[in-house]
Amino acid sequence: MDHFRFLFSPSAHALGQTILYSLFQSFIIFLCTWIILKLIPATSSRIKYAISYSAYMVITLSFIITLVYKLSTLPTFAVATNTMAQNPDKFVVWVSSSSPLFSFSYLDKYLPFLVGCYLAGIVWFAFRLAYNYLQTTRLRKNGLSALPADLMQSFEQLVKKINITKNPGIYFSSKITSPVMIGVLKPVILLPFAIINHLSVKQFEAILLHELAHIRRKDFGWNLVQSVADTILFFNPFAAWISKTIREEREKCCDEMVLQWSDPYHYAQSLLALQEPAQKQI
């Protein structure tokens, strides 16, 4: 039983209340975000992405700030509670007729169970995040092959075309089935071997432009921050909806950038061609 004592501690109580408050806070932010996104034209992916990401960070910071505030009020409460337990006759308890605007006190008896589930969940999701990150970083070290000289020359021209100052790395990889961009300071683009058999030069360049758009937008870093927030807020359905929207709009942002730099027909054909190897594997 000693192992579960923390679940009944003031700190666990503060965490449990923070989880409940987070659901209420995120519902308000979700509702505002949903309304705003509905009012924005479908073609404005950059604006939708910025609004969604900002809303998600507000939810995350609200959770952290609420938890810090709740924990900061614990020392006085804990000392007073212990003193009252030792000398109950020396204290008079005043009951106020007023109540806070939003109170979850009627759920207090469920908080130990709620906190236990949250801690188990965050350990699992943190482990999964760390594992996926390590697996991703290993991709840039194993099963790599250099591009042919003509494709490498095309790639370097595209890098200059979209004003990326430092050439990222690019390789064929035997470990993947779709293009991947990895890294922030030293980004690397990995391409599946099958891609060379299904794409024309123009289609190949369109796919490269999509990955270069991710590099130009520094999406790997922003996605990593988002993934950490996903781990903290794994319990929150309103946060999950916004996080899903962020990922969808991120891809649309890159698609819009590609359409500015290349022919829409070739890009559409390249996306269709990429589906062929995956369908054959299924």
Please state what every model-predicted region is.
Residues D2-N82, F102-I282:
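Membrane-embedded and juxtamembrane structural elements of multi-pass membrane proteins
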Residues M1-D2, N82-F102:
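Low-complexity, acidic polar-rich segments
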